[in-house]
Every structure is written in C-alpha cells, then in structure tokens.
C-alpha cells in the first residue's frame, strides 16, 4: 500500500538555517510513515532533486521517498498546483513568517478542497495580531512554537478547532556538554586564547536582535572590571557584521568601542562547530526586542551553558532561575510595518544588560546545571518530543480531513 504524501514548504532542509534545521528534523521523522515532498526555498526553480537514497541511509528506512522541488523564494500557487497534481498530496506543512505565504492563504479555499494545511507558527509579541485572523482561519491546524504564540492565536481565533502548543526541540546528541580539556583547547584554537570568561551571542544581524545594545551593555560591564580581569574576558558574536538589514558592526566597534575585546565569527557553520562554540562559552546571551523563541539560548542550555535573556516572547519559556539571568525590558512600545501593522517591542537598557552580565560573571563558578536534561524533557524542549507531537498532529489532521462539499449551480427558471 502506497504511503500518503506530505508537502512541506520552507527553507531547503539541507541548508543550515534555523528553519532548515527544524524542518529537517520534522521531515525525517515524518518520512518514517509518509512520503515527503518539499518545495524548497533557495533552490533553482527548475530543479527537482530526489534525495530518497540519502534519507533512507539517515533514517534506516529502505522505503523512504523524499523529493525536493526548487523555488527561489517560498513557492507559488502554480508550483503548488503542479506538485499536488503530480504527487497527490495528503497534507501541506508550512513554516516561516506568514507574509511569505500570502499566495497560499489567498487561494486557501482551492488548496484546502484538495488537502488540509498545517502551520508550524511563531509570533513574537502582543498585542494579539487580529490582522492575522484570516490566515489562522485558513489553516486546518496550527502548532504554536511558544506559549505566547499559543496565547495570541487562541485569542485571535477563539473558535479554531486545532491550536496546540508545540515548542521547538533540541537534538541533545548534536548539542551536548564537552569536558574541560576540550573546552580549553577549543578556546585556544578558535579564540586564540583560553579566556576565563567568554560571552557568546549567536544571532542574525537584523534590527530586532539589538546587537548595538549588546555591545553597549558589554562595554558597561567591561569598564567596571579591574585591569587584570579585563585581560581575560571577550565577547564573541556569531553573525554577518555587514548584513544589509542590520547594524554596521565593524563601524560601531572601530569608531565607538575600539578598545573593547570583541571577536566576530562571520562564516556559516555546521552544528558540530556550533556545539563547540556554545561549550567554549561561559554564557550565551539574547536580548532581542522581539523574539518568537530564541533557539540559540536553548541550544546553549543543552550544552550546560548558562544564559542571559530579555524577558520577552518565547525567551520567557526558557527561563530557569538556576542558570538564567533575566534582563527586564526598560521600555515597551508599539512598532510596525505595512505587513505587520503593530507589535510590541521590548527594549532593554545597556546598563541593565551590563549589570546582568556582571552578575553572571561573578556567580558563574557556582552555577549548577545538573538538571538541564530534566528541564529540557519536562518542558518538551527535545527534538524527539517536537517531532513526535507534530507527527501525531499530522496523523490526526489527515485522519479527520473531510473534503468540502462542492456546490453546483443550476439555472433557475
């Protein structure tokens, strides 16, 4: 008997992007019982690539079926029609910002007459986004990545039949603690020195990540250290310093903080290298003014690395008093664009950031993280839990799907 097929739309699962990594885990889990087709953002639009053999090896499923249909962005209605017609899809799974799928939601009546839509969704902050109500109602099921997302969706579409809290999960076989000897060696190899205190930020260089506030906050902390202690601290930022939609990090450091010990890692790295980076860090920080979830800090927890977070969005879900320093927002205001008319932004003050860094710096050797695995498991923050929950939701979605009745117009005389 032939398996049912799932069409996944999002970043190419072979690319090391945040969405790509998550969709890879989900799709490999689903491939155990479904045939998978991905409309893969970032591929040439003429490409159709069969990766069934490599998926079979990865999952030990000799019957795996997995094809990639290329798209330069996030697909089109014509491409989806072609894929559904060719592959006979049983469900569609989408993941990324809702505005990427305007073309899909505008044609939801047509698409949902053929198969249901599952949206793995995150929203950064209040107010409840009423302008997304038509999008939420266009989906047959919505998996909410944070508790705040779940709160937003359920308050916008109060009678939606299937909205479930389904947090991101970390693969603890890819992100795990290393021993002190390896950490010391990695610091020497990667940083050029076995620093006593490494503050690490892994973030895309876009405005909401507030990297300029981070540098200012680190400066507040650094200037209060003794001359001797200054020699043994460093801020490591993994980002693109010249990203067109971000801040000019090089100019900020050259002109404003030329004496500040900051290292930039600007090359895309695979998960084993990222695991090294979390482990060599004394602390991982995320003070974004909008953050739907914040994978970097949860990945850090999986390596037994303490975290500093802004008390906003999905970062709230990750707070554990044993190993988290929380920076409370100093200002909350409304900002927006044409696509996102309104959303709260929670800004932290550099002095508060500096104070939190200093607090963790002083207590770092006394922090105990022996219960980190229990924390991940109890909060469903493991990749296994994420994939299992989404797989169950897809099963239920397909089982309960009923094709809408088609109406026929007759001439009335």
What are these regions (language model features)?
Residues 1-53, 87, 387, 411-413:
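N-terminal subdomain of nucleotide-sugar transferases
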Residues 7-8, 193-209, 215-218, 235-237:
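Conserved donor-binding/catalytic core segment of Leloir-type glycosyltransferases
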Residues 346-352, 362-392:
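A charged, aromatic-enriched C-terminal amphipathic alpha-helix characteristic of glycosyltransferases
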Residues 129-131, 154, 170-185, 195:
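Acidic anion/phosphate-binding donor-loop and adjacent secondary structure
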Residues 289:
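Aromatic "clamp/platform" in nucleotide-sugar-dependent glycosyltransferases that forms part
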Residues 148, 169:
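Carbohydrate-associated surface elements
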């Amino acid at each position: 008997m032939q398996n049912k097929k799932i069409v996944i739309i999002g970043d190419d699962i072979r690319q090391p992007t945040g969405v790509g990594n998550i969709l890879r885990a989900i799709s490999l889990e689903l491939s155990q019982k479904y045939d998978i087709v991905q409309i893969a953002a970032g591929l040439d639009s003429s490409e159709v690539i069969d990766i069934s053999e490599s998926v079979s090896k990865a999952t030990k499923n000799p019957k795996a079926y997995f094809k990639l249909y290329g798209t330069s962005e996030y697909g089109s209605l014509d491409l989806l029609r072609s894929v559904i017609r060719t592959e006979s899809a049983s469900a569609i799974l989408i993941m990324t910002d809702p505005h990427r799928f305007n073309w899909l939601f505008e044609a939801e009546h047509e698409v949902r007459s053929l198969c249901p839509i599952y949206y793995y969704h995150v929203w950064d902050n209040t107010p409840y986004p009423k302008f997304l109500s038509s999008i939420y109602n266009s989906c047959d099921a919505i998996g909410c990545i944070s508790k705040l997302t779940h709160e937003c969706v359920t308050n916008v579409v109060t009678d939606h039949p299937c909205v479930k809290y389904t947090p991101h999960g970390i693969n603890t076989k890819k992100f795990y603690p290393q021993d002190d000897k390896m950490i010391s060696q990695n610091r020497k190899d990667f940083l050029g020195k076995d620093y006593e205190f490494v503050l690490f930020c892994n973030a895309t260089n876009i405005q909401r990540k507030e990297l300029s506030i981070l540098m200012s906050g680190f400066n507040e902390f650094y200037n209060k250290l003794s001359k001797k202690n200054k020699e043994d601290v460093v801020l490591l930022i993994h980002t693109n310093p010249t990203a067109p939609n971000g801040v000019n990090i090089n100019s900020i450091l050259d002109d404003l903080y030329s004496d500040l010990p900051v290292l930039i890692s600007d090359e895309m790295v695979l998960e084993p290298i990222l695991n090294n980076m979390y482990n060599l860090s004394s602390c991982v920080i995320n003070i974004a003014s909008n953050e739907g979830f914040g994978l970097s800090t949860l990945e850090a927890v999986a390596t037994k690395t303490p975290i500093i977070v802004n008390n906003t969005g999905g970062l709230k879900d990750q707070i554990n008093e044993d190993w988290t320093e929380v920076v409370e927002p100093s200002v909350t205001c409304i900002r927006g664009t044409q696509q996102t008319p309104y959303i709260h932004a929670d800004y932290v003050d550099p002095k508060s950031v500096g104070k939190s860094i200093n607090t963790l710096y002083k207590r770092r050797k006394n922090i105990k993280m022996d219960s980190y695995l229990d924390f991940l498991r109890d909060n469903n923050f493991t990749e296994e839990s994420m994939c299992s929950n989404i797989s169950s939701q897809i099963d239920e979605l397909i089982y309960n799907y009923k094709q809408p009745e088609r109406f026929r117009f007759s001439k009335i005389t």
